[in-house]
């Protein structure tokens, strides 16, 4: 706002509007997220979200999306899902859900989709809010 004083009021109003919108979203999630949800993700992409809202993925099929998980990793996740009675396994729209579906079918866990990149959302001023709300809603279904 100081670099473009002619539009200072516009920037300040936008900032205030955005911060209020963010506060409302955070308050909604804080009040109603299922902190006891048991879930596994396709890859470990949600640590900031998990830490901020007091939840934790119990595992991830892969740490690096460039490397497909091997038979050992798949077996370990399958055993984890069975041993911990994990309810949900999440895939991502950017990757083939075949392995997630296979593990879910053999364990009875439900599947869902988490989109850490927001690739399924329309670009624009609401993209971030839609992304965070979608993560919340899908995790809360768990």
Question: Model-derived features: where do they sit?
Answer:
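Extracytoplasmic metal-acquisition and chelation regions
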Residues: 1-142
